[in-house]
Amino acid sequence: MSVSTTLSTSTSLDLGPARALSCRECGHEIPLAPEFACPECFGPLEVAYDFVGVTRERIEAGPKSIWRYASLLPVPSDVTRHPNTEPGLTRLVRADRLGKEIGLKNLWLKDDTGNPTHSFKDRVVAVALAAARELGFSVLACPSTGNLANAVAAAAARAGWRSVVLIPKSLELAKIQMTAVYGGTLIAVDGNYDDVNRLATELAAEEEDWAFVNVNVRPYYAEGSKTLGFEVAEQLGWRLPEQIVVPVASGSQLTKVDKAFRELGTLGLVEPTPYKVFGAQATGCSPVSTAFAEGTDVVRPVRPDTIARSLAIGNPADGPYVLDTVRRTGGAVTDVSDAEVVDAIRLLARTEGIFAETAGGVTLACTRKLIESGQLDPDADTVLLITGDGLKTLDAVAGHVGPTATVSTSTAEVRRALQG
C-alpha cells in the first residue's frame, strides 16, 4: 500500500544494507519505499538485505547504543549525525536468586527498563525515525497501547519533529502523562487498541507527510527489535541462548529476535546453535496462545480484557508468524491470569531489584508456567525479555504493596514494627 507517490524510493535512498522490501507470504520484492503491504498478494512486507563487511570487531568498536548494529539495520550510513534518543545496549542481568526461586539454573534478564523512555519501544522508534527521515517524512506518528506513545513523542521532540499520537482513552494515566510531557499532539480515542490502529491506518493513507511508525513504515520500524537479539548474543560472549521467553502483543518483537539470531548465525558472528523461542501472553488477551494450544494456524481476534495493556492487541499482525517461529524452534506460547502477572511483578522486584511493568510480569509468570509444564529445560541457558518499567503501570500493584507499618515518632514503635 502506497502512502504517497511524492516520497522517496530506493533509487535515491541510503538505508544502509537494506536492498528491497520482500513479501513474507509470496516472496515478491519491491524497491525500498514507504510501503507495508505486498502489491501482489497484500501480505506484509519486511526488509531484505545485502550485508557487507559485518564483523564482531566492527560492531564492538561502534557506539554504545543500537547504532553499533547499523550495518545490520535499514538506516542511513550517517545515522549517528542526526538527533535521536540513542537507545540500546541495556544490561543483561544474571538472575541467580530469581532462577533459584523458579527452578532455572542459568537465567538472564534482558532489562530494557534502562532505555530513554523506559521500554524497548525506543529501539524500534529510533530505527523508524532514521528511515522516515530518509524516506522524506516530516511528522512522526503512531497508534499505541502506551510505551510506543512515550517513545514516539520523545524521539520526535529530540529530532525537532512534530508528533501525532493516538491512544485508547483507557490507557494508564502514567503513560498518558509520560507522552503528553514531550509536547506534540496526543489524541485519546473512545475505543480499544484495534480501533485506534484502524483509525491510524486510514490517516496514514491520507496524510502524506506522516510516518506512522507501526503502519506505513512498519517494515523498517520492526527491524529495531532485532537489536534485542543482537545485544543478547553479544553480551553472552557472542553465543545464542538455548531458550528465550518474549512477551507477545503484535508478535513482531518475537519474530524479529528470531530473525536476529538467524542473521548472526548466517553471517558467522555466532555459532548457529539450536535455540527455542517461547511467547508469553495475558489470558485476557491471548489469541496467539489459544491458537497454539488448539494446534491451528488461525489466530482469531479477541476483545482484550487484561491489566497488561501494553500487550492488549486483540488482532496481532504477526500472530501467525509467532506460531511459525515457536513451532519451528520447538518452543511454545502460553498465557497467565492477571493475578499471576501481579505476583510475578512482585517476585521479580523482590529477588532481582527490577520493577517491571505488566508485560514483564506476563513474561515471568508464563516462564513459571512453562517450567511447571516441562516445556522449559531447567538446565538450559535461558533469557527473559523485561521490556518496560513498572513506573509506567503503578496501578497494577496498587492495593498489593504499601508500608509494612505506620507508627508514631517513637523508636519503640519502630522496633515493634520490625519484629512484626
Regions found by a protein language model. Give the residues of each.
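PLP-dependent amino-acid enzyme catalytic core
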Residues: 2-420
